[in-house]
Amino acid sequence: SGLRGHRTGGSIHFVINNQIGFTTNPKFSRSSPYCTDMAKMVEAPIFHVNGDDPEAVTHVAKIATEFRMKFQKPVVIDMCCYRRHGHNETDEPAFTQPKMYKAIKAHPTTVAIYSKKLVAEGTLTQADVDAMQARFRAHLDSELAASEGFKPNKADWLDGRWSTPGTDRLLY
């Protein structure tokens, strides 16, 4: 990232750290304490933030953006969170990580935690939260219904110069 002629002016690397590989315990998945330790080789600052705290995530994202803009160097955000369900429909993470997933099952969702906070401070009412969730669910349902008859357009990125590879002459 600091090689002359190849600088990008910095980049923001956002790690959604669910603390687990497909079936690998974190202590067996790397030789360093954090999954973001590789960023130390380019001296990028690393911010670790709790994924259950949307305001903290937003705050850290703003700091990272300001750092990148001011110093034009890479920065890393390590959002520590968890995957409530498996990697896909066939994965049952409780088989390989039973203790972790027992704790996750007992832990409230990020939406529940943040909604409770907003209601407690008077920013929203529970009726507001319920209405927002109902609207979002209705949106998801309508998008799912729309996708059932969806036919993608022909890949237009293969038109033009790339439609006949090898026929254009390279100019040097």
Language model features: what each stretch is:
Residues 9-14, 76-79, 130-131:
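Beta-strand segments within the central parallel beta-sheet cores of soluble alpha/beta enzyme folds
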Residues 111, 121, 125-172:
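Hard-cation-handling environments
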Residues 32-60, 102, 106-128:
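Conserved thiamine diphosphate
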Residues 4, 19, 61-72, 118-119, ...:
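Structural signal for hydrophobic packing residues in well-ordered secondary-structure cores
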Residues 16-23, 83-88, 136-141:
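Short, conserved secondary-structure transition motifs
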Residues 54-92, 117, 123, 127-128:
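Gly/lys/ser-thr-rich phosphate-binding loops in alpha/beta enzymes
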Residues 1-37, 45-72:
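Thiamine diphosphate
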Residues 5-10, 25-43, 79-112:
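Flexible glycine/proline-rich, aromatic-decorated loop/lid segments
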